[in-house]
């Protein structure tokens, strides 16, 4: 289970995949349910470990040229590019989780199972406020991200306030690990 895409997620996954490979891994399930996202570069790192080299993983487009980027899988050694793969998502899966699940789906790398994801397809830059950055942070949206096939994950937010937007995202959601009859 990946809870959040933090600065060490790619490294932690690499260690876990190596241990699973050594133990005879035959298939892989990545649980991204209730993962609200995190760092774009860590989502790319995760994909780079499970997708063959040379593939477009995600791309970003913004109003300024520096926000436009294509992210591709590298030639790094991998241990988990051939095993059957399932990625679990739900309404709480957002942003970096949707980058991973979207690429897995678009590249036909595995099966994505669960409910619709949250729909946050925005790239944000973090700006520290105050002297030494200790008076808070401002998240500035600089781009939108697109899956390899060109899908924009971002849900429409025109004319909605923050609370309506959130409530809509979780409408009809099923609690994690629930058994539905």
What positions do the PLM features span?
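C-terminal "post-core" interaction segments
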Residues: 1-181
